[in-house]
């Protein structure tokens, strides 16, 4: 149990997808203007990461890995395209669910919802799972931990950006300039967790 708690904490804080690896930055910067929308996208990314990492783990271990299907067959050259296919299918299902049951969130996310398919944070989580050779239960913990870490980062940035609307920001730094500086400072703050030994 300690191993899974350690893996979860590491995925959320120490190896944060947005602030340690800088993955998923296009949606991270574009959707972080409003906390409510950022939280909705964070939930969507968490769901997709939490489902795609374990599903791709099964596909990788039982279909693509060398000798998985039969002796002498190695389909690992299909890793990337297969991982992207599974992610795309999950995003399409999520998009249909949000359109049907949460239309206001669906409209608020706009074009960024289908872009989760090519969000490099999702693909990065799946790639790290394969590279680090996580088993199925570890991939569940890692997927949800990575999603929660990304959601935490985007909600924190959105709340800071909402407060900065009322701040006296120098004219040359307004908009994305101060957002990049803020993201860098947040990354430095999260880097302090790297000294924690789990």
Swiss-Prot record:
Transmembrane segments: 11-31, 39-59, 77-97, 109-129, 140-160, 176-196
InterPro entries listed in its UniProt record: NqrDE/RnfAE, NqrDE/RnfAE_oxidrdctase, NqrE
GO molecular function (one): oxidoreductase activity, acting on NAD(P)H, quinone or similar compound as acceptor
Superkingdom to which the source organism belongs: Bacteria
Gene Ontology, cellular component aspect: Gram-negative-bacterium-type cell wall; plasma membrane
Entry keyword set: Cell inner membrane, Cell membrane, Ion transport, Membrane, NAD, Sodium, Sodium transport, Translocase, Transmembrane, Transmembrane helix, Transport, Ubiquinone
Catalysed reaction, written as an equation: a ubiquinone + n Na(+)(in) + NADH + H(+) = a ubiquinol + n Na(+)(out) + NAD(+)
Keyword Cell inner membrane appears in the UniProt entry: yes
Membrane association type: Multi-pass membrane protein
GO biological process terms held by the UniProt record: respiratory electron transport chain; sodium ion transport
Subcellular location: Cell inner membrane
Presence of the UniProt keyword Transferase in the record: no
Entry EC number(s): 7.2.1.1
Family as reported in the entry's similarity comment: Belongs to the NqrDE/RnfAE family.
Subunit details: Composed of six subunits; NqrA, NqrB, NqrC, NqrD, NqrE and NqrF.
Protein role: NQR complex catalyzes the reduction of ubiquinone-1 to ubiquinol by two successive reactions, coupled with the transport of Na(+) ions from the cytoplasm to the periplasm. NqrA to NqrE are probably involved in the second step, the conversion of ubisemiquinone to ubiquinol.
Name of protein: Na(+)-translocating NADH-quinone reductase subunit E
Originating species: Proteus mirabilis (strain HI4320)
